[in-house]
Every structure is written in C-alpha cells, then in structure tokens.
C-alpha cells in the first residue's frame, strides 16, 4: 500500500508507540514520516506544526486523553478532517460507539495483529480518499 502519509502515533507508552511504528513499517504502509506524542496535548501541538494525514491515538493518557483530543481536533478547522483511529484496550460497546459518533473514524482493540491493523488502516485511508 503506497500512501505517502504523515502519521501521528499518540500513546503514553513508548513501547506501544514503537510497536505501532514497527507494524506500520512491517505491513508496508508507506509513511513519509511517523511522529509521536505522549498525550493529546502534545498531539495537538504536533498537529499545528506538521502536516499530519492520519492520527492513531490511545484513549487513556495523562494531561489530555484521546476523547478530549478528538473534541479539540473536530472543533478546529485545520484538523477537523484528519482521520483518527482510536487504538485502545477499551471494550465497552457504548464507549466505542460514542467515539465513532464523536469523530473517530475507526477503533482498533489492543492487543491486535498486524493483519487487523492493516485492515483497519486500509479501510480508514480508503474512506478518506473517497
């Protein structure tokens, strides 16, 4: 898959950020650059400074979690159309449905396989290009 995208990985765990970056490279997702942020607050700063095409974000992080970050993104004309895939251990159907209603493009439950990751990202990127 050749997307040439700039991807922002947002998670308070450096191990998770590195694992996601490895999977991006392993599945052949052609990312121009992969940026990292430890929380939603850092992510919003990166979104202002860089041209990001896709955000992969955890929900529960210090300072600002994924839900609040999505609210801020959707309220800002510069970031409102950037797709966000939530990558979390959250399993509540109500929470997941709420995330999708509030602006997340998709949800990926941790732990996940590279194949599951590829499927979700391919669907998200494909929907964004239409």
Q: What does each model-identified segment do?
A:
Residues 14-35, 102:
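Two-component/phosphorelay signaling modules centered on CheY-like receiver
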Residues 36-45, 66:
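Helix N-cap/capping motif at the beta->alpha junctions
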Residues 50-56:
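Active-site beta3 strand of CheY-like receiver
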